[in-house]
């Protein structure tokens, strides 16, 4: 009898412990937001006077400008990467504060800090939309110099001896900059077809001194990189370090938007999923690196010679903010030759785009299947991932050479559900009709 009583008591204790553990566990979040291409009619950057060809050529030029600000310092073994202030191809509607104050910001996997221009603005670039005034938010709070939020910024943070308030200073590769206070506030985001999600105590940069080439129609940046103050790292365990996006093709209907998912909404599973290791580099923790082994053009496989001669691991950055896929010049030349030799058509020139491999689009152009062989994951590209129509009668290869850095751009990622798991350190790809998500 005593033994039975002890067993029952032990079972009750275990159940009680399990209940308390579940009660104390933080709920996992799952939510989705719209990603608006900067050339969409829903974007403040949209210019109705431009043709689709002009918009695409502008995006190509932005790709080149973005990578040309990747520079290497002689005294460091790892490259030092600077991005232009006006780079990034996708926008998010987010709101800051209580009550929510809406801003349209660039969503950037190549940046960390979420920042916006704030009133009063001592020295700011012209902005079409109203500035966020922290005094109007009941949940806004400047953080102290000794806070974990301030120390997470490391060399980008500074402190005022007068009031112990944490300040930040960010400079971009084109000499633009933003300076202001580090604070925490409520961030609200969501999409047109889901309930808005409120995220409390999110680190933001409240910029009171900003200048350079920032576009007056933009309101700031949402950093989705791998650094300690990025939105992904801040949400941390609540989203299990997971986010994913599905980018609709450039040829989609104008009213269709891409999606970005977080947490339980970001799981990539099912038939057709392939995964590759996500490589972390301590000196460049913002950027998401993958390992590219080779590229196949039809049955011809070309071994990849990456830009990082010290290691073949982590030799290409996956980036949503760059349109083209950019590869080291010599390797790209070999790839272009393989693509050209497999296409039975006359080459055309397009000096406006700067792309070197173009063909007439008036006939039935048959292009080879191109497969990206990442470490452990073969990603087969559709023709729309490898070629872009730059005008009514011209299509061009959506890859090009770069002086040193390799970037897996967003055209190659369109109509794939691309999932990042920063805990398991993997990136997954699943062919998906993104317009139906």
From Swiss-Prot:
Compartment(s) where it occurs, according to its Swiss-Prot or TrEMBL record: Secreted, Extracellular space, Apoplast
| UniProt xrefs under CDD domains | pepsin_A_like_plant
Which miscellaneous remark does the UniProt record hold?
Gain-of-function mutant CDR1-D (T-DNA tagging) shows a dwarf phenotype with dark and curled leaves, constitutive expression of the pathogenesis-related genes PR1 and PR2, and resistance to virulent Pseudomonas syringae.
Q: Where does the Peptidase A1 domain lie?
A: 90-430
Enzyme category, top tier: hydrolase
This chain's protein is named Aspartic proteinase CDR1
This entry's Gene Ontology molecular function terms read: aspartic-type endopeptidase activity
> Which species expresses this protein natively?
Arabidopsis thaliana
Which residues carry attached sugars according to the database record?
93
For this UniProt entry, what is the primary localization, expressed as one broad class? secreted
Gene label: CDR1
Question: A GO biological process this protein is involved in?
Answer: proteolysis
UniProt lists the family membership as follows: Belongs to the peptidase A1 family.
Which InterPro entries does this UniProt record tie to the protein?
Aspartic_peptidase_AS, Pepsin-like_plant, PEPTIDASE_A1, Peptidase_aspartic_dom_sf, Plant_Aspart_Prot_A1, TAXi_C, TAXi_N
Active site, UniProt feature: 108, 319
EC number per UniProt: 3.4.23.-
Q: Which GO terms describe its cellular component?
A: apoplast
């Amino acid at each position: 009898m005593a033994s039975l009583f002890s067993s029952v008591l032990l079972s009750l204790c275990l159940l009680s412990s399990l209940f308390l553990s579940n009660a104390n566990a933080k709920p996992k979040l799952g939510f989705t937001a719209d990603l608006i291409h900067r050339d969409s009619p829903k974007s403040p950057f949209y210019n109705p006077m431009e043709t689709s060809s002009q918009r695409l050529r502008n995006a190509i030029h932005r790709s080149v400008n973005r990578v040309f600000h990747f520079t290497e310092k002689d005294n460091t073994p790892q490259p030092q990467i600077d991005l232009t202030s006006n780079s990034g191809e996708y926008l998010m509607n987010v709101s800051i504060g209580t009550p929510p104050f809406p801003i349209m910001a660039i969503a950037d996997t190549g940046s960390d800090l979420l920042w916006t221009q704030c009133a009063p603005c001592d020295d700011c670039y012209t902005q079409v939309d109203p500035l966020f005034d922290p005094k109007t938010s009941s949940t806004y709070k400047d953080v102290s110099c000794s806070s974990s939020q301030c120390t997470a910024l490391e060399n980008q943070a500074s402190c005022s001896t007068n009031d112990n308030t944490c300040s930040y200073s960010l400079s971009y590769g084109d000499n633009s900059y933003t300076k202001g206070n580090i604070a925490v506030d409520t961030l609200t985001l969501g999409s047109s077809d889901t309930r808005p999600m409120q995220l409390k105590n999110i680190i933001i940069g409240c910029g009171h001194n900003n200048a350079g080439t920032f576009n007056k129609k933009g309101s700031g940046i949402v950093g989705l990189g791998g650094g300690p103050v990025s939105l992904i790292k801040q949400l941390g365990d609540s989203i299990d370090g997971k986010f994913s996006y599905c980018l609709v093709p450039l040829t989609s209907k104008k009213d269709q938007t891409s999606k970005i998912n977080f947490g339980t909404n970001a799981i990539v599973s099912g038939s057709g999923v392939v995964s590759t290791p996500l490589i972390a580099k301590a000196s460049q923790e913002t950027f998401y690196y993958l390992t590219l082994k080779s590229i196949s053009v039809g049955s011809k496989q070309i071994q990849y010679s990456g830009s990082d001669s010290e290691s073949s691991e982590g030799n290409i950055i996956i980036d949503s903010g760059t349109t083209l896929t950019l590869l080291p010049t010599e390797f790209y030349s070999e790839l272009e030759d393989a693509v050209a030799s497999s296409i039975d058509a006359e080459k055309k020139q397009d000096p406006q785009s700067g792309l070197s491999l173009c063909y007439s689009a008036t006939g039935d152009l048959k292009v080879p299947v191109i497969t990206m062989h990442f470490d452990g994951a073969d990603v087969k590209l559709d023709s729309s991932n490898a070629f872009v129509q730059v005008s009514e009668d011209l299509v061009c290869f959506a890859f090009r050479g770069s002086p040193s850095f390799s970037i897996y751009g967003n055209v190659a990622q369109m109509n794939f559900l691309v999932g990042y798991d920063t805990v398991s350190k993997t990136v997954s790809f699943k062919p998906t009709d993104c317009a139906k998500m």
